[in-house]
């Protein structure tokens, strides 16, 4: 008689009441640990991994998770060439000593700060701009533990995932950036995922226009999301030198040391 895996191996994704392991689940490995750990260790007759370490989504995750037709991995990260592995690690890492659905990669794991203050090190995989990372964990870390940034500019709420975190004036991070696996900007331009940003600000991409929420001019302020100045505001464009005078590092933090 078939047995439901989750009847013995607890899965938080199926526990809508948040009750935790019950009955036959007590004392047994979690579903994620069991499934990812077992499949991640599988080898063929020659001893080669059936699911390649660090392989593409099509060769690994999509063998079980929703695949190409569902497009569960899309948005800015996918457009940038990042794979599931770059954020989550390989199957053995996912099936290791982490709490499923809780110990997840974070925005701050790759966006570790700004142009003047961000993580450095030979064990980090940097994007061409030298600021952002292309891997949410340190090279050589078999557990793929998400990096914690020392700079809080792009940091999630303490103890919270991105999808539950809030930023500017209590707004959900997802309200401006999109959902975790479909962060803006998304291609193609005319895509259902882009409807919200189109409706809110008239074009695709991260919701960045202050006039989306604010009906009045905000003037010369650096109190926007992540310490930004007013965007699309003629008053700031005309008088921004007043902000820059005496403290160009305020500008360099985002525009770079050369202010380009």
Positions of predicted regions on the chain:
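Phosphate-binding beta-alpha-beta segment of Rossmann-like dinucleotide-binding domains, i.e.
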Residues: 4
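Inter-heme linker and motif-flanking segments adjacent to c-type heme-binding CXXCH motifs
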Residues: 12-260
């Amino acid at each position: 008689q078939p047995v439901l895996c989750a009847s013995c191996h607890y899965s938080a994704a199926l526990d809508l009441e948040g009750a935790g392991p019950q009955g036959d689940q007590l004392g047994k490995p979690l579903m994620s640990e069991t499934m990812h750990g077992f499949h991640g260790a599988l080898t063929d007759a020659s001893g080669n991994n059936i699911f390649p370490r660090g392989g593409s989504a099509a060769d690994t995750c999509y063998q079980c998770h929703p695949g190409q037709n569902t497009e569960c991995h899309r948005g800015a990260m996918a457009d940038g060439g990042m794979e599931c592995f770059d954020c989550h690690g390989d199957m053995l890492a996912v099936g290791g000593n982490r709490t499923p659905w809780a110990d997840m990669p974070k925005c701050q794991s790759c966006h570790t700060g700004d142009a003047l203050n961000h993580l450095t090190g030979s064990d980090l995989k940097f994007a061409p701009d030298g600021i952002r990372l292309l891997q949410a964990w340190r090279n050589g870390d078999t557990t793929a533990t998400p990096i914690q940034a020392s700079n809080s500019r792009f940091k999630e709420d303490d103890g919270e995932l991105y999808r539950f975190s809030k930023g500017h004036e209590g707004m959900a991070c997802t309200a401006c950036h999109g959902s975790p696996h479909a962060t803006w900007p998304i291609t193609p331009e005319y895509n259902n995922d882009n409807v919200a940003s189109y409706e809110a600000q008239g074009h695709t991409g991260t919701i960045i226009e202050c006039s989306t929420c604010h009906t009045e001019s905000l003037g010369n302020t650096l109190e926007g999301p992540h310490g930004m100045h007013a965007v699309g505001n003629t008053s700031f464009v005309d008088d921004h030198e007043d902000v820059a005078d005496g403290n160009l590092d305020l500008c360099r933090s985002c525009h770079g040391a050369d202010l380009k």
